[in-house]
Swiss-Prot record:
Organism name: Xenopus laevis (African clawed frog)
Disulfide-linked positions: none
Residue numbers binding Fe(2+): 88, 90, 94, 133
Name this polypeptide is given: Acireductone dioxygenase
Family per similarity comment: Belongs to the acireductone dioxygenase (ARD) family.
Pfam families: ARD (PF03079)
Cofactor dependency: Fe(2+); Ni(2+)
Length: 179
């Protein structure tokens, strides 16, 4: 199951946990209030997992691929890591399922504070359209993840500031309703 906590403001290596000196954990309920959903599946069975098939059908995730992020397998590795770690949003939900390895998604809370979400093998996360976020590997420097999409994939990031983007405006309205 994913773990989450408020981050420190250190400029130290982004792959470190960055917990506050006084650790402040974030519950799954707190993540849910931000529109972030997570669950755990059996990553060893992803190719034949009926639960994953059900999730894909119920959510109309018709397109998927697998991405491996490691210096030996990803072209332009360092450049890609910088792009993934740039704060941005998407027009559609971002769904990721960790098949191997681990990494961090960072999301902003209602007060614009960073929350770090640790994901490892078996964890699936859905980040809502319009949420500011970023991704980085952890100190293991490796992740293999399934990316799921409704329809054709769109990876266009809108770097912050993108507050006038319709997806962001809808997300801010969602936050106001859950406050």
């Amino acid at each position: 199951m994913v773990q989450a906590w408020y981050m420190d403001d250190s400029a130290e290596d982004q792959r470190k946990p960055h917990r506050l000196q006084q650790d402040v954990p974030v519950s799954l309920e707190q993540l849910k209030a931000l529109g972030v959903d997570s669950l755990s599946l059996d990553a060893d069975r992803y190719e034949s997992d009926p639960e994953l098939a059900k999730i894909r059908k119920e959510n109309n995730y018709t397109w998927m691929d697998i991405i491996t992020i490691h210096k030996d397998t990803m072209p332009n590795y360092e450049e890609k890591l910088k792009i993934f770690y740039e704060e941005h949003l998407h027009l559609d939900d971002e769904i990721r399922y960790i098949l191997e390895g681990s990494g961090y998604f960072d999301v902003r809370d209602q007060k614009d504070k960073w929350i770090r979400i640790f994901m490892q093998k078996g964890d699936m996360i859905t980040l809502p359209a319009g949420i500011y976020h970023r991704f980085t590997l952890d100190e293991n420097n490796y992740v293999k993840a399934m990316r799921l999409f409704v329809g054709d994939p769109v990876w266009t990031p809108f770097n912050r500031p993108a507050d006038n983007c319709e997806a962001r405006e809808k997300y801010v309205q969602f936050l106001a309703q859950t406050a």
